[in-house]
């Protein structure tokens, strides 16, 4: 497993958000994390990526330089881990609107320690692969939501991250653009042997993933392989998605 989580507990005040959660994530998987609002989906993503400190439990990351016990790292070490080993894609992209597409992606590369000229080269290559080769110098405010998410995907891959965490990456997009963005995520990440974890309410996003983990009240109640990932009309996850949306 590239990530092994055991007995994760997290509370905010008197409200338990994760309760004894354990799971293994493997290289090349695309894992959808579903569940009603308040079920602990985003908290689980934040726990696995070291964004938050757990109350109890362990997260082991088996990266290129060896095994890392994420929960034992200092804040500075966790920040370094995220910059160098993990990629992130969020619902709104969290891009700098005053910068161009190329500058947004290059900035992330330089934060990860890549020299400026090399960062620009990596950025241009990624944006070209995502169909934005003619938009390198366009500012984010001049781009559509789908184009901005493509920039966010490029930014998430500048460090060659073995694991990418995506939190509702298609939530602000229309259905056609959402399908395109999800297809790009799968092409850029699991189809390259890397790992993708996606928090989503969208059953079509879940259908495109190789595995669906469903949370309820901070616990995993279902963990299923999807033998027909990428075929939304012929999969077993619409019911899970409908439950998720009904509980939102």
Residue ranges and their predicted role:
Residues 99-108:
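Short coil-to-helix segment of the ABC ATPase nucleotide-binding domain corresponding to the Q-loop/switch region
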